[in-house]
Design a protein with these regions (language model features):
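Hydrophobic alpha-helical segments, principally membrane-spanning helices and signal/leader peptides
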Residues: 28, 40, 70-71, 182, ...
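Histidine-centered catalytic micro-motifs
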Residues: 50-59, 89-101, 193-200, 223-239
Length: 328
């Protein structure tokens, strides 16, 4: 994980000095170019990579429990500069999403939406932007987990309180340094989750092989710590990021038997974009035919179209599955 440590130092060296300069009373001919460079590097250069590093370290913290305070550096110190409010990511992703597996109790579930619909994606994104924290808190109340509820509320509240206070000194700098990264991060996280869980087998939505997708052979995986291997990540959330390609190669028949969708030469943004265009020919051309599981391109297109249809609520949750297993 040393590459992640080096990456952290690079972010500190780039963004902390630039943020300080943006809060200084620089002349406009210096401030505006600096703001543009900061925003470009943040949004297009490093934000996604930071979020996915935060993802890795949320699952596998760098430091042992006795040094846990050092694990707070990424979410509490560096995170706000990269669009992440403290504790919210961990609470949502570790404390909710992986436990609920995109089923009905998952606050970010894609099940009930038509996943090639621009209107449905807009509803999904806006709902998360404006009500995500409230629904997450309600989820933790329902599950009687006050610690994570309180952490997420405190982290998000302190982020906005800090932004308000800093706005009194320089609202333009606060907008560039904290608010724009925050908004764009929330949007891209929802875009990513939408793509990762777009093709759900309605007959078995609790099956990780049938509710998530994997993308391979794209530079996204080299830049973003193999985040494209989303199926294996749900099957084994604690699997080290370097081991995901091996998991796929060693379990090709399992993927084929479960009808798992693996795409190559495209990343999640491309999946989302082509879904919004309803370009199933393009999407199907990127699907990997593992062990000859498909007979034709037309069969792949038919499967893709079937698996983006909305799934009506029937009370399918991880709790209901566990209860059914106990009865059985």
């Amino acid at each position: 994980d040393l590459v992640l440590v080096y990456f952290t130092f690079r972010l500190i060296a780039i963004f902390i000095p630039m943020a300080i300069l943006l809060y200084l009373a620089l002349p406009l001919y210096l401030w505006i170019p600096l703001a543009i460079v900061y925003s470009y590097l943040n949004v297009f250069g490093y934000k996604s990579r930071f979020t996915l590093m935060l993802h890795i370290t949320s699952h596998r913290p760098w430091f042992k429990s006795e040094y846990n305070y050092l694990n707070k550096f990424l979410p509490w110190i560096l995170g706000p500069f990269m669009g992440q409010s403290p504790e919210a990511y961990f609470a949502h992703h570790i404390g909710m999403h992986h436990l609920e597996g995109n089923l009905e109790d998952d606050d970010s579930t894609t099940m009930h939406y038509k996943r090639d619909s621009k209107a449905d994606f807009s509803k999904y994104m806006l709902s998360f932007l404006f009500f995500g924290l409230f629904r997450l808190a309600a989820y933790f109340n329902k599950k009687n987990r006050p610690e994570l509820r309180n952490k997420s509320i405190i982290g998000e509240s302190l982020f906005f309180i800090g932004a308000i206070v800093l706005s009194y000194f320089n609202w333009q700098a606060t907008l560039v340094v904290f608010i724009l990264p925050f908004i764009t991060t929330r949007i891209t996280m929802m875009l990513g989750n939408w793509a990762q869980h777009s093709f759900i087998d309605a007959s078995d939505p609790a099956n990780e092989y049938k509710s998530a997708i994997t993308v391979i052979n794209h530079r996204f995986n080299q830049r973003c710590w193999n985040d494209g291997y989303h199926i294996s990540h749900h099957v084994k959330p604690s699997l080290h990021w370097t081991n995901h390609p091996a998991h796929l190669l060693e379990n090709k028949q399992v993927y084929a038997d479960n009808g798992a969708l693996v795409f190559e030469g495209i990343e999640f943004g491309g999946i989302w974009y082509n879904l919004m265009k309803k370009d199933y020919d393009k999407l199907a051309s990127h699907v990997v035919n593992i062990n000859g599981m498909y007979n034709s391109l037309e069969e792949i297109i038919a499967i893709l179209k079937e698996r983006i249809k909305p799934i009506a609520p029937v009370g399918l949750t991880m709790d209901s599955i566990r209860a059914a297993k106990k009865v059985a």
